[in-house]
């Protein structure tokens, strides 16, 4: 990812080390979350608004996916939490209150300082991270300012997330590849 900013103090990105966050869970909690599946909805984060073709396409065909809560890295075999406060909204099979309580616990746990790396953008900076073992967080106030923030992102196609139980992620609604192609072609 490369970024251009006009607001000097909005140049930080936070990357969560999802493998470390998983490893630091207690053994009983790891055993519990290993088999759980999360429901993810692709939508603009709070405070942001989709515009134009993106908004039209995502309203026509919402992107809803079931991912394992714990993902196994295809190359290293390490487990990591596959959680994102921006997308993950429920845990399949749990009552709403149970789901919300567990998500809050996992979100709070995963953003502890020992699991985060902060990267400060400088002119010409380019950052790479492995989304199979990390999670990206934009600055909290990025959408509450009048300053421009332009990001250039390359996402490499890869494999579907596989959980500790061996099951892959499943698209429940929408097609993210078709959406990306439609946006690219227009």
What are these regions (language model features)?
Residues 1-126, 131-186:
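Non-heme Fe(II) oxygenase catalytic core, chiefly the N-lobe of the double-stranded beta-helix
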